[in-house]
Amino acid sequence: MMASLSCVEDKMKTSCLVNGGGTITTTTSQSTLLEEMKLLKDQSGTRKPVINSELWHACAGPLVCLPQVGSLVYYFSQGHSEQVAVSTRRSATTQVPNYPNLPSQLMCQVHNVTLHADKDSDEIYAQMSLQPVHSERDVFPVPDFGMLRGSKHPTEFFCKTLTASDTSTHGGFSVPRRAAEKLFPPLDYSAQPPTQELVVRDLHENTWTFRHIYRGQPKRHLLTTGWSLFVGSKRLRAGDSVLFIRDEKSQLMVGVRRANRQQTALPSSVLSADSMHIGVLAAAAHATANRTPFLIFYNPRACPAEFVIPLAKYRKAICGSQLSVGMRFGMMFETEDSGKRRYMGTIVGISDLDPLRWPGSKWRNLQVEWDEPGCNDKPTRVSPWDIETPESLFIFPSLTSGLKRQLHPSYFAGETEWGSLIKRPLIRVPDSANGIMPYASFPSMASEQLMKMMMRPHNNQNVPSFMSEMQQNIVMGNGGLLGDMKMQQPLMMNQKSEMVQPQNKLTVNPSASNTSGQEQNLSQSMSAPAKPENSTLSGCSSGRVQHGLEQSMEQASQVTTSTVCNEEKVNQLLQKPGASSPVQADQCLDITHQIYQPQSDPINGFSFLETDELTSQVSSFQSLAGSYKQPFILSSQDSSAVVLPDSTNSPLFHDVWDTQLNGLKFDQFSPLMQQDLYASQNICMSNSTTSNILDPPLSNTVLDDFCAIKDTDFQNHPSGCLVGNNNTSFAQDVQSQITSASFADSQAFSRQDFPDNSGGTGTSSSNVDFDDCSLRQNSKGSSWQKIATPRVRTYTKVQKTGSVGRSIDVTSFKDYEELKSAIECMFGLEGLLTHPQSSGWKLVYVDYESDVLLVGDDPWEEFVGCVRCIRILSPTEVQQMSEEGMKLLNSAGINDLKTSVS
């Protein structure tokens, strides 16, 4: 290690050199930074061959991620000292002086990252050149000298811990069948026995030849000839691990990992532990004072934790969540087969690890306890950036989280700009070093208003205020939704057979039918005088309803009625100056004109789209735009009802959220096919004498006010099913969709099941496999329905944080009330689950598709048939997923988003 850098050190006039687990070189010469970097590159390129990045990362482990060259990081001297302590097996003593001018975390820019591997032991390590900076503005433009750009983990590999027979001189190496079939070339099983020669390379580009044979009773894959030579040359013993990978060039490579063994005696040439600790601190302090680059060596297998943290990761952990005692968290650990597994725990304390030397340091300032009893090898202190909090796991769901099968690219004949936009999440935590959003959300999707809505703690009364705020933005034209639509919204299709011309007005006969009577009431109510600010929105909303209902000629009466309502309302606004301002009337007239007059907008990239593709995308786009409006008032002689707009049935939300579209081809996205899929867009009215509000009570999970109706077939409900308390399934479907979207998916992290606190492994899978067999097409073919397939089981487990899980038989209860009462008695929560609105406690369950839903949302028979486990959430757990972690976005991210929207 030292010999390879001697020439560089002479030319750079090195003033400080420390060997061991943490080697640091501080440069004090007057040569420029570019010359030093060129020297480093020349020396590393001439002295050593280039290390294969994928094999290096496979040996390092799945959790290791090196920073990119040119990025900003935080360097923690405490973590570097821990690496020195592990290599010397001696911690720092009181003889190590304190450096008050050295901060606990030092902001640096990464100038170089070089991968290394020891020739004798194959121990891997990385050399990093760090430049201290005062702030993000001091970033130096780093040229590309072919240095490491980012971490490359292999996609195809397997890792096995060697047994005694694997390291014997006559046994050979047993390869798992799946690994052999996946990585090795196919065997000729017609030969007796099937054999082949494998040529693999290691980290040092050495070539090894193994004989791969399929034999034994039972038969298994073995590496025989050449394996003993490999074991002897690498000095492998039982407990060490061997990895086989295929890199991006499809080359077969092999690597080794040494098991941690106690070292009997340290070599006499190694410096004392105190000297090495002093060298780490002194070199870092000197580089900080003089703003000169310094070198560090990072050993991922020996180091307890990473001490070079990317700036974005640090800010996301420190500023993106408010950690508190009692908070639940998850943390990833490496498994024996080089996989990843999440362990769950609880924060029991927040304090400085070393208050004397490093007061206020974030390094391992969290005291934790693990759920599982066999976690003695897990650390009792962790850093905030090492854990995953509930808000980081669940609060940023992807817009496509409802899709259980991705649409095949061939359905779209090439991805368009709109297709790429709907695949992006609406909100993402900034990954850039300066905290700027990587891209702005699409303005016409009302991202600003959506962000504001999501920043607030949930309250059902926030929905009218949110709608009023959007209405004000629309009327005033402050870069609101309608203003953006004028500039960016693609217009309606040019298919006359599917268009309702404004000249085609239909006179509704009041005595024709009940449906016609309802349509007449709708027309009369929309023509009735209203408040000034609501008049404008009603006209615009009617235009959106007209577009949303324009699915086929079979619904021509409803569509034409809505068209008449829209035109009459616009005429009323133009004839009554007292009811609205000219600006309001002009906006409504423009929007109405946009619906009937197709135009082209090359800005959004729709000029070269096919007619059918444009039809589908425009229909979804305009329906989404109509989903952010205040509920308009429908009044009749005996009743008045506030009905939600057509957001509940907007085609875009079905296109994006609804799993029922996964098996459809692209040509089925036309309005005529949407009629078959979404027949629920028939808006019915109730003639009851009471005043009803179509605003079902929603849970206080995030995204309650921004969702689509899922698995709803309104054809099975009579007239009046959409109003007030007459539609219980409406609220249930909204509740189920919201809960599933809020809990099931995350853009930044993987999905996970709830941990098993009652014993067993308690594993939390990082990847959830979904069952696609639940989608069936009915005999008529007019709609898609999700059929709950009953699963054979005996008991259902009920889990609660901090308590031992219980098992119950849900079939022994008659309804939800009995179930909740029994669970309350089991866990001593009398009255908390039966009155969730006042207590704040939530009872959720996981179905056989791994969707997390609220208990009570679905019919009892369906719940009994699909429940897999039940989970009790305390008010703290519920609030953490909806409120915490948003303060940073509310203060910093929203400003950037406002600028991009306006």
UniProtKB/Swiss-Prot annotation:
Q: Where is this region: Disordered?
A: 497-543
Main location class: nucleus
Q: Name one GO cellular component term.
A: nucleus
Q: Does the keyword DNA-binding apply?
A: yes
Domain of life the protein comes from: Eukaryota
Q: Name one GO molecular function term.
A: DNA-binding transcription factor activity
BP-aspect Gene Ontology terms: auxin-activated signaling pathway; embryo development ending in seed dormancy; flower development; leaf vascular tissue pattern formation; longitudinal axis specification; meristem development; regulation of DNA-templated transcription; response to auxin
Q: What is this protein called?
A: Auxin response factor 5
Q: Can you name the source organism? A: Arabidopsis thaliana
